Amino acid sequence: MSTKKIAERRKSRAWSGPWLRACAVLVTVPLFASCDDNNWCGNCGYPPTSPSEASYGLVAGNFTQNGHTSVIATSTVYYYPHDNPGNLKIYPSTGAGTFGAPVLTPDGDDPLYLASADLTGAGPLDVVSASFDDGTLTVFYNSAQKPGTFGAPLILSSPGASQVAIGDMNNDGLQDLISADFNVSLFVQTAPGTFAKPMSLYPGGANWVAVGDLNNDGIPDVALTDSVGVKVLLHTGAAASLTYAAPVAVFTQSVNPGITGANLIAIADVNGDGLNDLVITDPGPVGSPPTVNILLQNKSAPGTFLAPVSYTLSATSFPQSIVVADVNGDGHPDIVIGGSAVVNVLLNNASAPGTFLAAASYATTNATQVAIADVNGDGLVDIVVPVGVSHPLVSGVYTNNPGVLLQVAGSPGTFAAEKDLP
């Protein structure tokens, strides 16, 4: 199966959450069993009775440099199944747990996942958006003079882009971009704000990529999802060489004829041994719930991994985003997995780091991309998702605002019910 088909299937399956929600909000009709690119909101009609906003990607961080969390989500008003102009919807922090009115910045058509990092070394966090329909990565540079505002973006051609990872791939102090596109394109930053022509790392293409040192040589490697499962590309030679060994398969997706190329990957040292491990979701075979799988790096053979240990996720959750971070403040990385209607949280077992407690599931409107950040300034990290619980009608468009699951004070690692971003 081609990478294009893989990505289209993933996008189609992913849209079953936000587009189905849009149908339910827009008109007084039942929820439909099928609602994707090939079936424009079922009986909602074409175009829909009223245009609707869909939000898929999201990042959170100190974008305004005021010490508080701001939130940025993708925003697309859907008039047609494809090629709808998108925006970044920026919610600037005005204090602990307070936000200004959202500001729109034009993005590519139907933007999907976002990533953020300081790309230029100027201090403020920048944002990168992946657009499968446009076949682009769009780089938004945060103003060092007025943090939280973004000028004209840099657009990079990346056919098939569905997601992007950021990392300094050649250890030159500049952050580079790795696109989950038809070629797994590596965009090397040659000077602040300037990228070389892309290198193709894996012509078979990928639907998800992650970067991190996977063999303990101090140089980032690449993990990717293809139609079969997960492969690892280990860097070889000096950092500046940007050469990689042949891809090695480390995980095979469960057989599910309706879903291929659906693994998500995160790279982190989950057991505290100084070696990065792999955290991989799997949608599961037909009739079985999805899982998250831990592949610990083999101490005696860096760059290889032990057999996966599997943990069951909510049966109603199709995994669409993954974050590994310490959410309960015990110093051990935990796992947060977002889906169309559920967030799963797996806490690392402090008594046996690298093993995890059973997943706790939290209902959400839409968690296609999750972010971990302290939203209300209480010193506890919260879970932020692209779509909250209300959908106000604004100028004839049913809109979305991000949602947040606040961490419960006095109960580390547990979260309150979703509510709209304040």
Feature annotation, model-predicted:
Residues 1-17:
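N-terminal secretory signal peptides that target proteins for export/translocation
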Residues 31-34:
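C-terminal motif of bacterial Sec signal peptides marking the signal peptidase cleavage site
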Residues 36-53, 92-109, 141-159, 188-204, ...:
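Blade-edge motifs of beta-propeller repeat domains
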Residues 56-65, 112-119, 162-169, 207-214, ...:
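Beta-propeller blade termini
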Residues 68-69, 123-125, 173-175, 218-220, ...:
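Glycine-aliphatic tripeptides that mark coil-to-beta-strand junctions in extracellular
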Residues 71-75, 127-130, 177-180, 222-225, ...:
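Hydrophobic beta-strand segments that make up the repeating blades of beta-propeller
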Residues 76-82, 133-135, 184, 229, ...:
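Short glycine/acidic-enriched loop and turn motifs that connect beta-strands
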Residues 86-90, 136-139, 183-187, 229-233, ...:
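A short loop-to-beta-strand structural motif that recurs across blades of beta-propeller domains
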